[in-house]
């Protein structure tokens, strides 16, 4: 059945008509026949005397999860998801197509919040206490999805397929009667005198606009311009968005020959000129991968997230300092090199090197090349000063960062609606009643490892809970009012 929106203004018009509506938008007049939202699901029978409408902008993780939660609490609430592309598109490609649902090692709120470069202070309150990683894993398990936690804490479906997560969410939203409208985009939003929202919804083909009055509006459109524009129209400010979670381009032609080498544990430090404050998180320890253009891997991605804003101001220029033997003191590195020299004095330096460092031959030759020690040089001819230089190179190898490259498994942005303008215990706007936000449209971003999806699940759940409770309360008030009449 189609959603009953008889008391809402919903009309089709060409986009140019938007500018002529002015403030008289409580009910738009059209010469065309009024049209209702069509539903791709089959909603439960509605209580037409107390119908209210929730429009969710964006059918990503936060939007779908929030819609499900709201509809679960308030079955009589009409819930419509508006998505300009495919629903749950980022879920499909994340984690190499496996979907990194959350992180199972950081379940305590204080520890969990520290994984959010933007939000680590604000999220230490009720946000994750209301719906954290354990709650997320329980929800999916209760809905038939088997999950597994890998050694690094990342949680994936046992199927190793993001389709399992997508099918679960879409099946539940359909079962509840959530309507999904694709190939449409909400392009205008304004409050009405009656406390509702007049939304202009552009259809992708042909180019025309529908208008609808919504009782509740949840903006969960990710890091695209659409959500920022709607938030601005409704009185919110926007922190300028910049990329987060990216790899480093390095100015070193010889590094390309090392592409594919992985270092299991490296201490990586990012130095940025004229940085006015100390950022402890600009030093990270973890795996590092050499790419054709520079460096990637978990340690690099964490650096990029914590340095996202300052790097954007420098044009993504800085110095990357890598310690390839983080568990070995510099004096011990010197000692190991000296012992190796004494033991293998007659062997070529390029062919023989200490196994204690866990290095591969290609990288060892790279280190020697930077010290000018390649060729037929024997260990016996290596001076003490040269050994010290090699030791320092292993512990303090600097690279010039000249730019960034997108990390294809993540599409994360720092910036968005400031958290100071949102009540995090409800996700409701402090500026506009009945307006809610969830997900990456907010100025929240996490490091790699399932943290960005957890932000989406938590925010969507809290927003959906708040909307559902308000809708139920409104229905009870209306029922009581009718009873008194």
Positions of predicted regions on the chain:
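Short hydrophobic core segments
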Residues: 55-57, 186, 210-224, 231-232, ...
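A conserved short coil-to-beta-strand element within the FAD-binding core of flavoproteins
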Residues: 182-197
């Amino acid at each position: 059945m189609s959603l009953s929106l008889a008391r809402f203004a919903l009309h089709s018009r060409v986009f140019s008509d938007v500018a002529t509506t002015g403030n008289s938008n409580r009910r738009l007049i059209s010469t065309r026949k009024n049209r209702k939202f069509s539903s791709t699901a089959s909603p439960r029978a509605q209580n037409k005397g107390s119908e209210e409408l929730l429009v969710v902008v964006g059918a990503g993780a936060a939007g779908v999860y929030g819609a499900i939660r709201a509809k679960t609490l308030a079955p009589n609430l009409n819930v419509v998801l508006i998505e300009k592309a495919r629903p749950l598109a980022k879920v499909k490609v994340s984690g190499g197509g496996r979907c990194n649902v959350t992180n199972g090692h950081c379940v305590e709120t204080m520890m969990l919040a520290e994984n959010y470069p933007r939000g680590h202070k604000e999220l230490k309150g009720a946000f994750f206490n209301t719906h954290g990683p354990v709650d997320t894993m329980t929800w999916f398990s209760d809905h038939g999805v088997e999950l597994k936690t890998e050694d690094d804490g990342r949680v994936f479906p046992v199927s190793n397929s993001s389709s399992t997560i997508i099918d679960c969410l879409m099946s539940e939203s359909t079962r509840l009667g959530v309507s999904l409208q694709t190939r449409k985009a909400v392009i205008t939003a304004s409050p009405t005198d009656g406390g509702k929202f007049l939304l202009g919804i552009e259809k992708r083909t042909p180019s025309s606009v529908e208008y609808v009055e919504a009782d509740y509006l949840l903006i969960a459109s990710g890091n695209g311009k659409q959500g920022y524009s709607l938030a601005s129209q409704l009185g919110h400010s926007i922190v300028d968005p910049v990329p987060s979670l990216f790899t480093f381009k390095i100015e070193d032609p010889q590094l390309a020959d090392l592409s594919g080498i992985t270092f299991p544990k490296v201490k990586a430090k990012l130095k940025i000129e004229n940085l006015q404050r100390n950022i402890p998180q600009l030093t990270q320890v973890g795996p590092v991968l050499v790419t054709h253009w520079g460096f990637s891997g978990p340690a690099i991605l964490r650096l990029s997230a914590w340095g996202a804003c300052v790097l954007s101001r420098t044009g993504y220029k800085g110095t990357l300092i890598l310690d390839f033997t983080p568990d070995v003191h510099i004096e011990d590195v010197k000692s190991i090199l000296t012992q190796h020299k004494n033991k293998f004095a007659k062997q070529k330096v390029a062919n023989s090197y200490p196994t204690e460092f866990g290095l591969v031959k290609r990288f060892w030759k790279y280190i020697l090349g930077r010290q000018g020690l390649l060729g037929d040089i024997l260990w016996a001819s290596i001076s003490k000063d040269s050994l010290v230089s090699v030791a320092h190179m292993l512990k303090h190898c600097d690279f010039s960062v000249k730019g960034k490259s997108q990390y294809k498994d993540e599409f994360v942005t720092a910036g968005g609606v400031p958290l100071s303008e949102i009540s995090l215990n409800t996700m409701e706007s402090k500026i506009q009643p009945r307006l809610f936000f969830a997900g990456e449209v907010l100025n929240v971003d996490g490091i790699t490892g399932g943290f960005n999806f957890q932000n989406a699940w938590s925010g969507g759940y809290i927003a959906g809970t708040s909307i559902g409770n308000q809708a139920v309360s409104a229905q009870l008030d209306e029922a009581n009012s009718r009873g008194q009449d």
